[in-house]
Regions:
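Extracytoplasmic
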Residues: 26-57, 139, 247-252
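Extracytoplasmic gate region of multi-pass secondary transporters
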Residues: 44-45, 227-272
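Helix-loop-helix hairpin linking two adjacent transmembrane segments in secondary transporters
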Residues: 149, 157-209
Length: 400
């Protein structure tokens, strides 16, 4: 009797629909909207800079744990949610994620201006639960409607939609502050968009594939860590997520300016450009070699952000870091899968669990900033993450 908790439905698998050369564009729209909604949880790291202004210095250590409340749930709930999805399906799991997202966004808003920090923890915790369900469901839901040979390109499109939601964060917050004096209307706006996305998905018929007779279990996933390539790539994804969240946490603190959140806009705008450029380059250059180039550049940019203080230089360095980090997740994921192609489900399970590494970024970066009194020193944590990824890129073998 299989006792391992199953992960099969959190992994893209080849379904009869995927073998068809055409994409059902009627279904594609609401699924890509899911990627857009997926990006809402990533606003927590940069928005903590605004929340921190509402609390005294004695509470700043607690505020820095807010991003942890989102990413912790990837570690705790990814497996149970995958098991639930085995029973109720991918679309239903995504809709449950939308519901938790709406409630999580509205809790601190309904609590009101100047609410206790606990309301933010409760709201962002629920937001993390919802986002875990969305992450578990949306990628494989996309896999049911696109042909297998085009999965990579459509997953890239999905990431562009996710990054676009982050790109719009700073302009929306800046406009809200100018019009209302507060950023907090962002929460019901995001909640409303999530409701619309849920209605759109619910109204769309999605033919999900039949269940597989054999599901990947947790023991199967962790057993793969004995493969050096899979281990390097799993830790690479963990460092990528941790570094990415760290940049989001620090970007609004690197410039002492009310418009400092615009550094987040530059970061994600350049990431979108980097994703598009990477999609073109990776057809012509080895993925590992491209990873080496980008991580070398990213490490140099981290060093620059430790030293530079001019606003223009900070904007440029943060933006270029976003460009360099654009294709990292896809590269580690692809290299690990190619190392053990017969264990693709187990590899993907490890990657989902690795996302939980983002939970450490806020507390660690916050502690460094409080210890040093300078947000730029928080880039030491990001540099450590990038340094590992650069080292791993040289340990990985280039497949011709």
């Amino acid at each position: 009797m299989e006792k391992n908790v199953t992960l099969k439905n959190c992994i893209p698998e080849i379904s009869p629909l995927m073998r068809v050369g055409k994409v059902d564009k009627r279904v594609l729209g609401p699924v890509l909207m899911g990627f857009f909604i997926m990006g809402f949880c990533d606003m927590v790291a940069p928005i903590t800079g605004r929340i921190a202004l509402e609390f005294p210095a004695s509470r700043q250590a607690a505020v820095s744990f807010l991003p942890t409340m989102v990413f912790l749930w990837f570690l705790v709930l990814s497996t149970p949610l995958a098991a639930l999805m085995n029973r109720i399906g991918r679309k239903a799991t995504a809709l449950i994620g939308y519901a938790f997202t709406v409630v999580g966004l509205m809790v601190p808003y309904v609590a009101g201006e100047g609410c206790a920090l606990g309301w933010y923890f409760a709201g962002f915790g629920l937001l993390g639960v919802g986002n875990t369900a969305i992450q578990v469901a949306i990628n494989p839901l996309l896999a049911t409607i696109v042909p297998g040979e085009r999965m990579t390109s459509y997953l890239t499109v999905g990431q562009i939609f996710r990054n676009t939601s982050l790109l719009l964060l700073a302009p929306i917050v800046t406009a809200l502050v100018a019009l209302t004096g507060s950023w907090r209307l962002l929460l019901p706006i995001y909640a409303g968009l999530t409701v619309l996305g849920g209605i759109w998905l619910q109204a769309t018929s999605v033919a999900e594939p039949p269940r597989s007779d054999r599901a990947a279990g947790m023991a199967d996933c962790f057993r793969l860590l004995g493969n050096p390539t899979v281990l390097l790539c799993t830790l690479g994804v963990a460092c990528f997520i941790a570094g990415d969240v760290g940049i989001g946490f620090l970007s609004v603190r690197l410039i002492d300016n009310p418009d400092s959140i615009l550094t987040t806009t530059g970061f994600y705008a350049c990431r979108i450009v980097g994703t598009l450029v990477g999609a073109w380059v990776l057809v012509r250059v080895s993925d590992v070699k491209y990873l080496r180039w980008n991580m070398a550049g990213a490490l140099a940019l981290c060093a620059a952000l430790l030293l530079v203080r001019g606003e223009t230089a900070v904007y440029a360095a943060v933006g270029l870091t976003g460009f360099a980090m654009a294709c990292v997740f896809a590269t580690f994921y692809a290299v690990a899968t190619k190392a053990v192609p017969e264990k693709a489900n187990e590899v993907a399970g490890l990657m989902i669990l690795a996302i939980s590494a983002g939970a450490v970024s806020g507390p660690v970066c916050g502690a460094i900033v409080r210890w040093s009194g300078d947000a730029h020193w928080g880039m030491l944590f990001v540099a450590l993450c990038v340094g590992y990824m650069l080292w791993a890129s040289f340990k990985l073998k280039i497949k011709q």
